[in-house]
Amino acid sequence: MKYDTSELCDIYHEEVNVVEPLFSNFGGRTSFGGKITTVKCFEDNGLLFDLFEENGLGRVLLIDGGGSVRRALINAELARLATQNEWEGIVVYGAVRQVDDLAELDIGIQAMAAIPVGAGSEGIGESDIRVNFGGVTFFSGDHLYADNTGIILSEDPLDIE
């Protein structure tokens, strides 16, 4: 489904939170949305492999990487795994790498920056916890909508159709 965050803000301005404009699109989908699962991990993406093994239909993985752009949390291998398991999208408060490969995949990916250095894979981090960045607090189960204009968040799903 295609989302227009500008239109959604016009319709639901009282019901949505708008994330500060820190992110760029790196995925093959220009818009995406779904119920979020939150993860907090700093320069380590080991936990993400297990999460992307889950069925991602209707889901978006929201990663709080502490805003670090020193190491990429998402690479082509992880994004392919997410695509295979039907994840709608990924939002990274941090960096990605292998951006040409990411752009070829049918998944939405928003991140702060790209860098060629990969993350560690110790599995250090937490999932399904409250995270805060971009002026918004995110909880697993909230609904996120993203396009090239921005990212918005709603406690409940928005009536799009």
UniProtKB/Swiss-Prot annotation:
GO terms for biological process: negative regulation of RNA catabolic process. Homotrimer. Binds to both RNA-binding sites in the C-terminal region of Rne and to RhlB. InterPro entries: RraA, RraA/RraA-like, RraA/RraA-like_sf, RraA_gpbac. GO terms for molecular function: endoribonuclease inhibitor activity; enzyme binding. This is Regulator of ribonuclease activity A. NCBIfam families: NOT-MenG (TIGR01935), PRK09372.1 (NF006875), RraA_entero (TIGR02998). One of its GO terms (cellular component) is cytosol. Signal peptide: none annotated.
